[in-house]
Amino acid sequence: MGESSRKPSRYLCLTICGYRKPGMSEEDYRRYMTEVSAPMTKDLMVKYGVKRWTMVHNTTATRALMAELCDSQMTNVVDFDCFSQVVFESLEDYKRMKQDPWYKEHLFHDHENFADTKKSMMTIGWIEEFVRQGVAVDGMDN
């Protein structure tokens, strides 16, 4: 089999811990991200090899649910508005996506429409998967 058909041993996961633009409501933020930003972004991500992109919207209402889960080990609740996770194999492919002229023209400045880009934070690490769709698994699917 060719090199491209091999299953990588692991994938990188870029996690953006996002805050919404000051003055924007939680619902407007979620709506903009899911109805404007995501449709503009997802095909470009696929073009550059992104395997998965998800958003977790951490609203005031969902943060309140943490009161039911807190115990002596789980006491600190974060206040980020969203966790956006991008899973990919190649850091170089992701960097090439950010250099794509369409990204630069349409997406780079769009973040200012909904995100507090100065306050939001990011990290990257290896993703490991153990349960998928209710089934125990040993790693990510290709």
UniProtKB/Swiss-Prot annotation:
Residue intervals of the EthD domain: 22-117
Pfam family, one: EthD
Source superkingdom: Eukaryota
Residues spanning the membrane: none
Substrates-to-products reaction catalysed: atrochrysone carboxylate + H(+) = atrochrysone + CO2
UniProt keyword annotations, A-Z: Lyase
InterPro entries referenced in this protein's UniProt entry, alphabetically: Dimeric_a/b-barrel, EthD_dom
GO biological processes: secondary metabolite biosynthetic process
Broad class of enzyme this protein falls into: lyase
Tissue-by-tissue expression: Specifically expressed in conidia.
Pathway assigned to this chain's UniProt record: Secondary metabolite biosynthesis
EC numbers on record: 4.1.1.-
Family: Belongs to the tpcK family.
Purpose: Decarboxylase; part of the gene cluster that mediates the biosynthesis of trypacidin, a mycotoxin with antiprotozoal activity and that plays a role in the infection process. The pathway begins with the synthesis of atrochrysone thioester by the polyketide synthase (PKS) tpcC. The atrochrysone carboxyl ACP thioesterase tpcB then breaks the thioester bond and releases the atrochrysone carboxylic acid from tpcC. The decarboxylase tpcK converts atrochrysone carboxylic acid to atrochrysone which is further reduced into emodin anthrone.
Protein name: Decarboxylase tpcK
Taxon lineage: Eukaryota, Fungi, Dikarya, Ascomycota, Pezizomycotina
Gene this chain is encoded by: tpcK
